[in-house]
Amino acid sequence: MTDRFQLVSPYSPAGDQPAAIDKLVANFEAGLAKQTLLGVTGSGKTYTIANVVQQVQKPTLVMAPNKTLAAQLYGEFKSFFPHNAVEYFVSYYDYYQPEAYVPSSDTFIEKDSSINEHIEQMRLSATKTLLSRRDSLVVATVSAIYGLGAPEDYLSLRLILSIGEHIDQRQLIRHLTDLQYTRNEFELTRGAFRVRGEVLDVFPAESDTEALRIELFDGDIEQLTLFDPLTGETLRKLQRYTVYPKTHYATTRERTLSAVDTIKEELKERLEQLYSQNKLVEAQRLAQRTQFDLEMMAEVGFCNGIENYSRHLTGKAPGEPPPTLFDYLPPDALLVIDESHVTIPQIGAMYKGDRSRKETLVEFGFRLPSALDNRPLRFEEWEARSPRSIYVSATPGPYELRESAGEVTELVVRPTGLIDPVVEIRPVGTQVDDLMSEIHERIKLGDRVLVTTLTKRMAENLTEYLGEHGIRVRYLHSDIDTVERVEIIRDLRLGKFDVLVGINLLREGLDMPEVSLVAILDADKEGFLRSTGSLIQTIGRAARNLRGKAILYADKMTRSMQAAIDESDRRREKQVEYNLEHGITPESVERPISDIMEGAREDAAEKKSGKGRSKSRQVAEETPDYRAMKPAEIAGKLKSLEQKMYQHAKDLEFEAAAQIRDQIQKLKTASLA
C-alpha cells in the first residue's frame, strides 16, 4: 500500500497534453478555485486528468453525468492507478420507486426499491478510503449530492483493533452489533460475524473478497489475519485493523433514543397545526404512521423509511443541508466534473424535483415536515462544499466559463494526429435517400454510422424504412436502460449491425472508433437538440476514425450551425499544423471491444485478494453472457449462485466454489453499469 499516486502508462504526454497538464497543475497549486479543461473527443482528457492527479497528489473526486460514463472512467482510472485506491460511488438502486401521493386520484404509492449489494459494498469502500487514505480517487455520479450518514458518526462508531490490545469478547461482540453487523454461525457473508471459542471471524461490509479473523487469548488480541472467506486461505497477517459500520446510516443507541424524543416533539407540533386547520384525516394518518415508526426505532433501532428522520438522527437544524459524500472529502481535495455541460445542470435540477414530491407528502399527512430535509444538496450548497475544481468538456457551458474567469485550458491537438471530421451541409429535401447512399458506402468500408433525428416518431419511421431496404439498423430510445444501452453500443462496434438511430442519446458517451459517419437530420431546426454545444458533441462522435465525416442536413444556415462549423474548422486547422510540424500521419484509434468494467473489476479483485491467492483459483469455464439481463434477473441469479457457492465451500469442494465465484464476479460486473 502507498500513500502516493503512482501513474502507470505505456506512453508519455503528447500534443497539447504537456502544456495542459502544466497549466492545470500550476493553477491548482496557486489556489485557483475553478478552471476549465476544454478537450475535444480523442484528445486524451482522462489521461491528462490522471497526470494532474499524479502531480498534485491530492484525494480526488471525479463526477460523471451517468452510470455508463462513470463505469468507463472507473475502468480507465483503475488502469492508470493500479497501486492506488480507485473507488466507485453511484446509486445502489437497481430499481427505485419513491413514495408519493397523487391528490387528484387519492392514490398513495409506497416506496419500492431493489438494492444492488455489490454497488453498496463499493460505496462503503469509497467512504472508508476517503477517510483513511490520501491516495484515493473516487468516481461518482450525481448520487454524491444525496444524503449519507454524518462522517463524524461513521468515524466515532468504527472499531479499531491492534495486536496486544486488551478487549473483552462480549464487549467486542456488542460493538460489532452497534455497527449493525449480524451474528451468523452457519454462513460468513458480507456484514456478518461468527464466534468460535476465542476466535471471531468478521466479513467487513466494504470488502468483496477478504474477511478478518480476530484471535484472542486471555482477553488480549493475539493475532489479526485477513483470509479468504470462501476457502479459509490465509492472505496476510496484520498489526492493526479498523472495522467500519455496515451502513452509512449507522448511529449510536443514545443518538437514536434522542431522535425518538425530538420526533415526538415535532409530531405534537405538527398535529396541533393540522387540527387547527381542521385536517382530521391528515392528522390521524400522520399520528398512526409516525407512532409505528417510533416504536420500531425504540425497539430495534431501525424502521422502514428511516431516512425521512435523518435530520433528527444527525442532529441538524431545520433547513440545514444533509451530510453527503462531499463531507467525507478532505478540504484540500480536487474535484473533477466530467462532461460538465451536462453534469452541472443535473446537480441544479435534483433538489427541485425531490422537493415538489415531498411537499405533497407533508401537506397530506404522510410525513413530518422534517422529511423535507432528507434531500439532495441545493446548487448553492453544492458550490459551497466543492473543493478546488476542474470542469472538463468539449463544449463548456456558460456557468463553467463564468466561474473559471477566463482560465480555460485547451486540449485540441490529438496525439494520434486524427483531424476533426469534415462537416458537409446537404439539403433536407433529399436527406433520407442521400443518407441511404452514404450508409451503403460506409458499409462497404466496414464502418459504422450514427444518425440523429429530432423526434421519436421520425427515428422509428427511419429505422423501419432503412430496415426494409436491407440495412442492419437499430434504434436507441429513452426507454432502454443503461446496461442494455451499453450492450447495443458494443454490438454496433462488433458489427452485429451497421447503423444506430437515436435522438439525444448519442452526444456524450462511450468511444466508438468504428463510426466514420454521423448524420444530423433537420440540423437547421434551432433548439436544445440543435444548439452549438449539441452539434459539436454529435459531430465529435466521428472524431476517432480516420475517415470521419459529419453531414448536416439543412436548408438554411443557423447561428448554432455556423458556430459549430467554425469551431470544428478551427480545431482542424490547429491539428493539421501540429501534424505537419511533427511529421505525424493520422491513424484511426484502435480500442479493444470489451465490457467497460471488465478490466477494472479484475484488477480490483486481484488487488483486494492480495498475493496469497494462487493463479490456479481462476478456474471458471465459459459462462453465459449476463450483460443484457434485467436488474431483477441479475439479483435473483446472484442469490442462487451465492447459495451454491457457499454449499460447495461447506462441502469442502473449493474448486467448484471458486468456479461459481468467478461467475458471480462476471455477473456483478454486468450489473455495475
Swiss-Prot record:
Motif (Beta-hairpin): 92-115
Domain of life from the UniProt record: Bacteria
PROSITE patterns named among the record's database cross-references: HELICASE_ATP_BIND_1 (PS51192), HELICASE_CTER (PS51194), UVR (PS50151)
Compositional bias of kind Basic and acidic residues: 618-630
Keywords: ATP-binding, Cytoplasm, DNA damage, DNA excision, DNA repair, Excision nuclease, Helicase, Hydrolase, Nucleotide-binding, SOS response
Domain Helicase C-terminal: 431-597
Molecular function per GO: ATP binding; ATP hydrolysis activity; DNA binding; excinuclease ABC activity; helicase activity
Entries under NCBIfam families matching the protein: PRK05298.1 (NF003673), uvrb (TIGR00631)
HAMAP family: UvrB
Similarity comment: Belongs to the UvrB family.
Protein name per its UniProtKB record: UvrABC system protein B
Origin species: Xanthomonas oryzae pv. oryzae (strain PXO99A)
Organism classification: Bacteria, Pseudomonadati, Pseudomonadota, Gammaproteobacteria, Lysobacterales
Gene name linked to the record: uvrB
